[in-house]
């Protein structure tokens, strides 16, 4: 797992740019999909989906440069069909270079890299919901983060009303890519309760499935997508005593009921 390509704050010195195992953030290969694109029938389109998670404000000469360079290298291989996405915790629990400036350096770097959409992670709520929406995301006409920050399972307390944008539609190479973002339901136990007193966190799989059905119901007025990507900010079980262990999907499902539900119950409409 590469620090730049498949970013994890637990791995700093790995050498491989790509490992085709269950721990990869995405496959980093162009995805060939059979769809009707640009008015044609029976056509295919190439999508190069680039994904990272848990960046945690790793701003530094030996971290930011290789991370950014790898993204640019992969994007250059498919300049018209690449889409940069993230699965949350881009900010929070950051290095001093970023945390001392309330993660503004990280936001600036990700803006420059052309991040298009990201799930919120639990650390996006470290400074509270108001800070996330008012400063990090910003308001209409004065955006800070230039990507769509998504939280389909984040609701105004006591209601089913979304507290954040639920999905983003990105047009890539003639394909409408619907990106749905959700965060762990345990977020309320991981951050200060005072900062999230007006919101609550629902079941992430149920939220993904609800939005996926909306994006495939044939009604253009509520959003439609040719391809759906779910960005889950959620973790599978890990064995910190054996970093070389490579458990199978079935072993991971047995070790983590949450991971099992994601794998087994996410709507098949999600690609």
Regions found by a protein language model. Name each.
Residues 7-9, 16-25, 39-271:
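Acidic, metal/ion-coordinating pockets
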């Amino acid at each position: 797992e590469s620090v730049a390509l498949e970013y994890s704050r637990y791995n700093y010195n790995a050498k491989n740019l790509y490992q085709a195992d269950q721990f990869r953030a995405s496959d980093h290969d162009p995805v060939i999909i059979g769809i009707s694109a640009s008015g044609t029938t029976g056509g295919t389109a190439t999508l190069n989906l680039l994904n990272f998670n848990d960046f945690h404000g790793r701003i530094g000469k030996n971290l930011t440069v290789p991370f950014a360079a790898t993204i640019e290298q992969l994007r250059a291989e498919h300049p018209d069909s690449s889409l940069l996405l993230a699965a949350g915790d881009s900010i929070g629990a950051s290095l001093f270079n970023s945390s001392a400036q309330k993660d503004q350096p990280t936001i600036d770097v990700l803006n420059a890299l052309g991040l298009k959409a990201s799930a919120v992670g639990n650390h996006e709520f470290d400074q509270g919901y108001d800070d996330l929406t008012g400063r990090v995301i910003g308001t209409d006409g004065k955006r800070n983060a230039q990507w769509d920050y998504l939280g389909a399972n984040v609701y105004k307390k006591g209601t089913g009303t979304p507290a954040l944008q639920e999905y983003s539609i990105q047009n890539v190479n003639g394909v409408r890519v619907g990106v749905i973002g959700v965060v762990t339901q345990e977020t309320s136990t991981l951050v200060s309760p005072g900062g999230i007193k007006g919101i609550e966190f629902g079941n992430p799989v149920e939220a993904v499935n609800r939005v996926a059905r909306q994006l495939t119901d044939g009604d253009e007025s509520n959003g439609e997508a040719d391809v759906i990507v779910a960005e889950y900010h959620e973790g599978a079980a890990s064995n910190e005593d054996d970093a070389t262990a490579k458990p199978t999907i079935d072993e991971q499902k047995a070790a983590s009921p949450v991971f099992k539900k994601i794998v087994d119950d996410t709507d098949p409409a999600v690609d």
